[in-house]
């Protein structure tokens, strides 16, 4: 997810029927995301404000909240024997990079569970997955810095300057430090943490965010653990490393060759298999726990992130022009049938509510239904603070129109983020 100014014949007939929009929006849920960093000043040390605003959220018409309890630093806001507790939140503070201290000792997640349930809300824990540190000028914070041996867990990226650089020491970017999803130690750490959450008293669900490769896109994932896993997948050492010989890849500008295709497929297989393990681990602890994932709706370019969030039944090569190269092996990495629900970020400018294509909220939701093929309920919605036309507020009247439009196509509504409701005083909106 993005924060920006706040601190993703008979069988055919059955398939088409599964992908048709519902004729009624009655009873469809409405999810609200509560980002940890962006809302820390309001709730990090104030349980009374949590209780007050859960009531206000319910009054707006939301049915579910997703409480981010593991920001990109990798510290956590719940009781854990696995992950370090968050004692201070890094970010932009008073005109420079710094920290906001957490001085309270109440259980942040439990406070939201208690207050949310009292207000009639279902409460889900949002978890940033493939991250474990935070870096800015003068700041190196989080578990990969507290325990330097864990820097070997980080993604290694092929930068534009032609260098392979560990994300923990990369100074080109500010913010979260990404971990390599192919690293077995990373996976086991995250699975153990999810098991703790699955045992949390009263928690209704878990939503994974950033369960993907890092923002260097196709140039991400070149750690030693990644190389070993890819070699195992190939059954031989890769003839090129990095696989893409020209750094700075943003989009595919040609049909990938055999090794490049295998690399793109490998990364999606890593994420697919991790999601399967995560779902199993959570449901072993609590079979009734809802287990979901957030993804961006812009699937036409999602190969960049190493995630295939579609149904494995969905014929990518024939249905998606930007995936004409996709093999049956790539199609099989579709993960939609592994989760209980999906949050789909239909992030667009405020002017792009209606339409049938990507880059419109309605189109994103419509295409989401087509791509998921009935495998999983999905809840779609906008970022109402960072996209063009939203960044200065003043869109209170538009929000119910967006919600009604999206709920005609999706199984429910999702909105990012509570910080924008607070910033622009949208509390009087009613859905």
Give the ranges of each region predicted by the language model.
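Active-site-adjacent "subsite" loops/lids of carbohydrate-active enzymes
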Residues: 27-47, 125-200, 249-260, 311-314, ...
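Aromatic- and acidic-residue-enriched segments that line the glycan-binding/catalytic groove
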Residues: 77-90, 131-170, 210-250, 304-316
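Substrate-binding cleft of secreted/luminal carbohydrate-active enzymes
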Residues: 324-431
